[in-house]
C-alpha cells in the first residue's frame, strides 16, 4: 500500500488490456490473401484433419486462420475476410475465415446455422 506522499510523486498507472487478436488492429474484420492452404492435426485428446490457411493481411501481419464448415474452395492467392476467434484445439490459430464473402464461398447444402457459414436460404 503506497503512502500519500508516494501517490503525489507518481500516480497509479492503468493496466493495459492485452488484445486476443492483435493482427486485426482494433478492426472487426480484415482482408487478406492466402499464402498457403493446408490441414493440421489438433491437440491431444482430439483427432482430425483441421483445414487452415496462412493469410497475409492488409495490416501487414501473416496469420494462421481456420476455415470453418465442410468443404471449401480456397487455394493460394484467394482473397479472404478474417475475423477474430480462436480454435481451442489448434495452438496458434486465433482467427477465423468468414465464409460467403470475397473468394470464400458459403457451405453447400447447409440447412441450419446458415448465417455462420454464408449459406443462402434453400428454395422450397
Curated annotation (Swiss-Prot):
Gene3D superfamilies assigned to the protein according to its UniProt record, in alphabetical order: Nucleic acid-binding proteins
GO MF entry, a single one: tRNA binding
Biological process, per Gene Ontology: translation
Chain residue ranges for the region called Disordered: 104-124
Modified sites of kind 3-methylthioaspartic acid: 89
Protein keywords: Methylation, Ribonucleoprotein, Ribosomal protein, RNA-binding, rRNA-binding, tRNA-binding
InterPro entries: NA-bd_OB-fold, Ribosomal_uS12, Ribosomal_uS12_bac
Coiled-coil annotated spans: none
UniProt feature, compositional bias: Basic residues: 113-124
One Gene Ontology term, aspect cellular component: small ribosomal subunit
SUPFAM superfamilies: Nucleic acid-binding proteins (SSF50249)
NCBIfam families: rpsL_bact
Subunit structure: Part of the 30S ribosomal subunit. Contacts proteins S8 and S17. May interact with IF1 in the 30S initiation complex.
Function: With S4 and S5 plays an important role in translational accuracy. Interacts with and stabilizes bases of the 16S rRNA that are involved in tRNA selection in the A site and with the mRNA backbone. Located at the interface of the 30S and 50S subunits, it traverses the body of the 30S subunit contacting proteins on the other side and probably holding the rRNA structure together. The combined cluster of proteins S8, S12 and S17 appears to hold together the shoulder and platform of the 30S subunit.
Family under the similarity heading: Belongs to the universal ribosomal protein uS12 family.
Record protein name field: Small ribosomal subunit protein uS12
Natural source organism: Picosynechococcus sp. (strain ATCC 27264 / PCC 7002 / PR-6)
Designated gene of the protein: rpsL
